[in-house]
Amino acid sequence: VFRSAGFAEISRYFSARVPLKETTGPTPPETDGLDVDEWDGSDPEALFRQVFALSRRASRNNAFYKPISEVAFLARYMPVVPMMKRELILFARRSDGSLAGFLFGIPNYAEGPNPKSAILKTYASLEPGAGRLLAYGFHKAAFRLGYENAIHALIHDNNTSANRSAAEGATIFRRYTLLGRKLNG
């Protein structure tokens, strides 16, 4: 219907599922000076201020990135804090303590009050290898918390994360196509 109305494919994405028992293999190669830690659950506003600053830098070259103010960013994310599980919020920090990457995971609340899946929702990094360390840490934490599966959500088909998800044995269960159309005038 949309294509017949002049819309064309702009980008393709997918979501995939992987049993967590299959992702807890060998630790990724060490990345000099990076440590991955879980969020301690304190000061969520400070957490999101750091995430905002890193996100701006890590995302600025993404095709659909549109800058927003820190105030707007905080207004968007602070309401979800009560739904967050601190053990699924991870940070990669350099030896000087500065933030090199972050990962947000959430329980799959669509499965009801006792979800069996955790969703690797968003991650961004500024250092090579940080994303891989964060994903590994997420899988370990989710497995430790009793989740059976991880969902790698909304991954661009041509992103490094797509290759990593496939290498971990994830099976695609949903595909998405972003359509667009140039408007006249």
Tell what function each PLM region has.
Residues 56, 60, 78, 82-85:
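Generic surface-pattern signal
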Residues 43, 73, 109:
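Short, catalytically relevant binding-site loops at active-site mouths
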Residues 1-23, 79-81, 87-90, 95, ...:
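Active-site/acyl-donor-binding loops of N-acyltransferases
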Residues 28-69, 99-100, 185:
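Short amphipathic alpha-helix that is part of the acyltransferase structural core
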Residues 67-82:
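Beta-rich nucleic-acid/ligand-interaction surfaces
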